[in-house]
A protein has these predicted regions:
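Alpha/beta catalytic cores of nucleotide-metabolism and tRNA/nucleoside-modifying enzymes
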Residues: 1-10, 14-15, 20, 26, ...
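Glycine-rich, positively charged N-terminal anion/phosphate-binding segment
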Residues: 2-4, 19-93
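N-terminal small/glycine-rich loop or linker at the start of catalytic domains
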Residues: 9-13, 48-71, 105, 110-113, ...
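Hydrophobic faces of well-ordered beta-strands that scaffold small-molecule active sites
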Residues: 14-17, 40-42, 72-76, 99, ...
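Active-site beta-loop-alpha junctions enriched in small/polar residues
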Residues: 19-21, 45-47, 77-79, 104-106, ...
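Alpha/beta enzyme core
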Residues: 33, 85-99, 103-113, 124-206
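Conserved phosphate-coordination/catalytic loops
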Residues: 78, 120, 124, 184, ...
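Short glycine-enriched, charge-decorated loop/helix-capping segments at active-site entrances
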Residues: 114-120, 179-180, 247-248
Length: 341
């Protein structure tokens, strides 16, 4: 029987929120170097992609972990209960401390596929997916969701549906799907959410998410709401990659972290190239699917991170503009060196 990582975390624990195209295996190593949270989450992995021959390779790449990740939770999404069971059963051997079902992502494509926040509208299906996942694994199963789909008041009916299933943890983003991140998080509802948890599933760890920027704010919230067990930081990491510490980084420390990110990206790229090349040699069908081309990591998504490191000093915008014209990590390093960083 696997340990319940949620029961081992300290009161007031911190989590890096799962963010599509952000919290991959490379960036998590950067955050770990700056100052890691108590718990990491992966990016979202679609259960039906894992269940298909065509999509499994990509799903497994999303689930890759580094030694510095532990403990880490695999976050998964979808709407097919059997596929939830299939992926949940495979996760035990991949180094995860648990799995989390996303029932809160507001992305319209995810919602159109019946996943993420769309599950708020299909509570019976949501419960069945949760049950199937839990039955297939000894890992603790948790859920991340929102207050509701359209109206804030939905939480009074929606959260008890989940809590009655006794998930290991429940993370509540304090907004609705309709609100996205356009309005302030509804911190005023925390006491009522706590009462719901205490009355329905007192053993479930409660995590709050939304408008939480750094460790200092986590501690302030912990003092105000001592019954909440943990806090999840998402976009705050873009403002300060040291957000899980009390350290205020200097400009040069941020550039040092930037160069580390580039090095880790290159290492992951080389690893992916080697793995793909080996598989193509061993599997002619896979080589045919790849058109005989060995592909590493795409460079363009790396540019999403530049604003984390290059901000808050005179000339930052101009330097970022130059960096955005780069096409390789070597070009990025050359621009940084020329700029004196």
């Amino acid at each position: 029987m696997s340990k319940n990582i949620w029961a081992e975390l300290p009161q007031g624990f911190t989590i890096l929120a799962p963010m599509e195209g952000v919290t991959d295996v490379v960036f998590r190593q950067v955050v770990a170097k700056a100052g890691r949270p108590d718990l990491f989450f992966t990016e979202f992995t679609n259960v039906s992609s894992f269940a298909s021959e065509k999509g499994r390779e990509n799903a497994l790449e999303r689930l890759e972990v580094a030694p510095t990740d532990a403990p880490i939770i695999a976050q998964i999404w979808g709407k097919n209960p059997e596929h939830f069971a299939e992926l949940a059963g495979a996760l035990e051997g991949l180094g995860f401390a648990g799995l989390d079902i996303n029932m809160g992502c507001p992305d319209r494509h995810v919602n159109a596929a019946g996943g993420g926040a769309a599950m708020i509208r299909t509570p019976e299906l949501a419960v069945e997916c949760l049950r199937q996942a839990r039955a297939a694994t000894a890992l603790p199963v948790s859920v991340k969701t929102r207050l509701g789909y359209t109206y804030v008041e939905e939480f009074r009916e929606w959260l008890p549906v989940l809590l009655r299933e006794k998930p290991a943890a429940l993370t509540v983003h304090l907004r609705t799907r309709k609100e996205m991140s356009k309005v302030p998080a509804h911190f005023e509802l925390i006491p009522e959410i706590v009462r719901l948890r205490d009355s329905v599933a007192p053993e479930t760890r409660l995590v709050i998410n939304g408008d939480i920027k750094d460790l200092r704010q986590c501690r302030e919230l912990a003092a105000q709401y001592p019954e909440v067990n943990g806090y999840m930081i998402g976009r705050g990491v873009f403002e300060n990659p040291y957000c899980f510490t009390e350290h205020e980084p200097t400009v040069e420390e941020l550039f040092g972290l930037f160069r580390l990110h580039l090095d880790l990206f290159d290492a992951q790229d080389m690893k992916r190239l080697a793995e793909t090349s080996e598989k193509m040699r061993e599997d002619p069908a896979f080589a045919l699917k790849m058109d005989g081309k060995v592909r590493g990591l795409p460079f363009e998504p790396l540019k999403h991170y530049f604003k984390i490191y290059v901000a808050g000093f005179p000339g930052a915008a101009e330097l970022r503009a130059r960096l955005m014209e780069c096409k390789t990590t070597e070009e990025v390093r050359a621009v940084l060196t020329e700029a004196g960083h």
